[in-house]
C-alpha cells in the first residue's frame, strides 16, 4: 500500500516538471559552440581553394574516409584534383581539421545529414567547397608560408634556434 502511494506521489510531482524531450523537427536542439558537424572546404580571401593537397588530413583520419589526389596548376600551385569524404564512415573526430596547415578543412555545426541511400553520403570536392572563407576570413596560406620575418635572419626570430650545418654533426 505504501509503495503504491509513493509511486502515485512521484508521478504527481513529475507532471509539473519541465520535459526533457524536445520535438526535434519542430524545435531545433541547442548545439554547443564547438560542435563538430559536417566538413567543408573553404577558400582563401582571393577566391582560390585553400587546400594544397598535402595529404595530412587523409593521414590523420583514423577511419580512412578521406581520399584525394594532388595536381598542380600553371603557377605550380598544388590543389586536389579530386577530394572525397565518405560521411558514412566519418566519426567527426576533427583530426582532419587540426592537421590541415592551410585551414582549408573546417567542421560546421550542421548535423542533419540523414540519407536513405548510403551512396549519397560520399561527398565530392564540388559538394564540400563553399564560396566563403569560413572561420578564418583574413588568412591566406601563400601570403605567410615561407616569408621571411622583416629585419631578422634565419634563426633570429623569437624562440628559434640558428640553422644547423648537418656536416658539422658527422664524426
Curated annotation (Swiss-Prot):
Q: Does the keyword Cytoplasm apply?
A: no
Give the 4Fe-4S ferredoxin-type domain ranges.
Answer: 41-71, 81-110
Q: How does it sit in the membrane?
A: Peripheral membrane protein
Please share the entry's free-text remark on the cofactor: Binds 2 [4Fe-4S] clusters per subunit.
Pfam families, per database record: Fer4_7
InterPro entries, sorted: 4Fe4S_Fe-S-bd, 4Fe4S_Fe_S_CS, NADH_quinone_OxRdtase_chainI
What catalytic activity does the UniProt entry give for this protein? a quinone + NADH + 5 H(+)(in) = a quinol + NAD(+) + 4 H(+)(out)
Q: Which GO terms describe its biological process?
A: aerobic respiration
Q: What binding partners and quaternary form does the record give?
A: NDH-1 is composed of 14 different subunits. Subunits NuoA, H, J, K, L, M, N constitute the membrane sector of the complex.
UniProt protein name: NADH-quinone oxidoreductase subunit I 1
Q: Which organism is it from?
A: Nitrosospira multiformis (strain ATCC 25196 / NCIMB 11849 / C 71)
Instruction: Write the lineage as a comma-separated list.
Output: Bacteria, Pseudomonadati, Pseudomonadota, Betaproteobacteria, Nitrosomonadales
Q: Which gene encodes it?
A: nuoI1
